[in-house]
């Protein structure tokens, strides 16, 4: 359920963007690229079952209000996820942003929990605080599931803490 809600929030934030209304289409805009390292607790069926380390890279362009990126993560049980998608940032204050992301990707289970298939969609909500011109920290909640592509689709959540650095 949460993944669907996050996907809807991502869509609403994108469509209603004050910075680039959808009526303008999705023009290519040069923007600040950045990298993010994320440390997470993995939650499965309301229980913390492990940890995850994630690396994300966001490109030097946006299409309208959304910035493309790619990401890879590995859990302490060897579960691997890699994907590519978009982030939408909403400025709440000079240094505070509310971010929504949507990343389709490939899931390799290893000894991790069975999520029902190999194609997984990650969507999340993140509160980010900018520290100077280069750094930011954030906390987030993320949902990963197949979007009911397979009969068995239990989903997986992560509770994330991230450190990001702009690429100069």
Language-model regions: role of each:
Residues 51, 129, 154-168:
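Outer-membrane beta-barrel "beta-signal"
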Residues 35, 61-68, 94-98, 133-139:
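Repeated loop/turn-to-beta-strand initiation elements of outer-membrane beta-barrel proteins
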Residues 41-52, 72-83, 92-94, 110-118, ...:
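Solvent-exposed loop/turn segments connecting transmembrane beta-strands
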Residues 57-61, 88-90, 129, 143, ...:
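Residue-level signature of outer-membrane beta-barrel architecture
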Residues 1-29, 168:
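Cleavable N-terminal export/targeting peptides
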Residues 37-43, 53, 57, 68-74, ...:
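Transmembrane beta-barrel strands of outer-membrane/channel proteins
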Residues 52-56, 83-85, 124, 160-162:
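Membrane-embedded beta-strand positions in outer-membrane beta-barrel channels/transporters
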Residues 99-156:
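Outer-membrane beta-barrel translocator/channel fold
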